[in-house]
Design a protein with these regions (language model features):
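Conserved nucleotide-sugar donor-binding catalytic segment
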Residues: 16, 88, 127, 146-236
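Glycine-rich, basic loop-to-helix element that forms the pyrophosphate-binding segment
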Residues: 73-90, 111
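Short aromatic/hydrophobic "clamp" motif used to bind/position activated sugar donors
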Residues: 95
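Conserved donor NDP-sugar-binding/catalytic core segment of glycosyltransferases
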Residues: 107-140
Length: 326
């Protein structure tokens, strides 16, 4: 065996990235699900975001494993920055993400890598999922959206929020991640969705329509909402408006960004009127041609101009009216 072929045989096919901050009771099964993969050519990069001593002690025991590397970080609370720190250490041809409270099924990596290598035009992949509870049992939760699989060109589906891609479901070419710049560390929340949008601008996506990941629901599970959620979507759509070259899709992005701007300004107006005014002004340059935009601006402007006391009274009146009507 030549030196170059020996080096190639030692090179991992997949770099698995797990960011973690405490949650030791869920971290253990997450790591065990990586160790149980039927595909053996992987490396595991665990980026620790300043966890407590108990979690750090457990991670220290893993450093003796030949394919595991722990990256010790000061706490930032920024998932994108933590994942990027691990991404800079990755050496695999592909990168797979796993959250510290979720798990993989044993065949996940093997099936995804085989499918990606058989279809060179698709440089990233995702899978179906099941919901699990704190104990790892499969559960069905009220309000869960039905699984609607999409493959191929999915940018418009992503923009319209018609496709659900969980972070632990994704495997992506490392070169493609480098091409789009990794995670945006300035995203308030939903930095994964922002990355999917940028990946979809450069490549079609493959799908393994099987539930190969378990997404855990528990009390510590974070769900962004309100202003942070809208601010994140606004930032992503603004980037998409600059990146998308197809004229029809660009109009779609423009309309979505205009509506998101109005929604964000309206919500900001409840507590931060100056921020709401700045948000409205930021949307004018891209949205001034849309008739619906000006109707929305008028509505939000009236809301901002109304004294807070009257506005609160108006809102209470609307709620009371609705309750009487029903």
């Amino acid at each position: 065996m030549t030196a170059s072929s020996e080096h190639a045989s030692l090179q991992p096919v997949v770099s698995v990235i797990i960011p973690t901050f405490n949650r030791l009771e869920y971290l253990r099964p997450a790591i065990e699900s990586v160790l149980s993969q039927t595909l053996s050519h992987w490396e595991l990069l665990i980026a620790d975001d300043g966890s407590d001593m108990e979690t750090r002690a457990y991670l220290t025991t893993l450093e003796s494993l030949p394919r595991v590397k722990v990256i010790w970080l000061a706490h930032t609370g920024n998932p994108g920055a933590v994942r990027n720190a691990a991404l800079r250490e990755a050496t695999g041809e592909y990168v797979a993400f796993l959250d510290s409270d979720d798990v993989w099924m044993p065949m996940k990596l093997e099936l995804q890598i085989a499918a990606l290598r058989s279809c060179v035009d698709r440089r990233w992949s995702y899978t179906g999922y099941v919901c699990i509870d704190e104990t790892g049992r499969t559960r069905t939760y009220p309000g869960t959206r039905p699984w609607i699989p999409h493959r191929g060109a999915i940018l418009e589906h992503l923009l319209m929020q018609e496709v659900e891609i969980w972070t632990p479901a994704v495997v992506v070419e490392r070169r493609l991640l480098a091409q789009v710049g990794g995670f945006d560390e300035k995203q308030p929340v939903f930095e994964d969705y922002d990355l999917w949008l940028r990946l979809a601008c450069h490549s079609e996506i493959d799908l393994i329509d099987q539930p190969l990941i378990g997404v855990r629901s528990h009390d510590q599970h974070y769900c962004g909402g309100g202003i942070r959620m809208l601010a994140s979507r606004h930032r992503s759509l603004s980037k998409m408006y600059r990146l998308v070259t197809d004229s029809r899709l660009r109009r779609v992005v423009g309309r979505l960004r205009a509506q998101c701007t109005l929604d964000l300004a309206s919500l900001q107006g409840n507590t931060h009127r100056l921020a709401a005014a700045r948000t409205l002004l930021s949307g004018c340059t891209l949205s001034w041609r849309l008739m619906d935009w000006w109707a929305g601006v008028l509505w939000v402007s009236l809301k901002l101009a109304t004294p807070r006391g009257l506005h609160a009274l108006y809102r209470r009146g609307r709620i009371r009216h609705r309750s009487v009507s029903t």
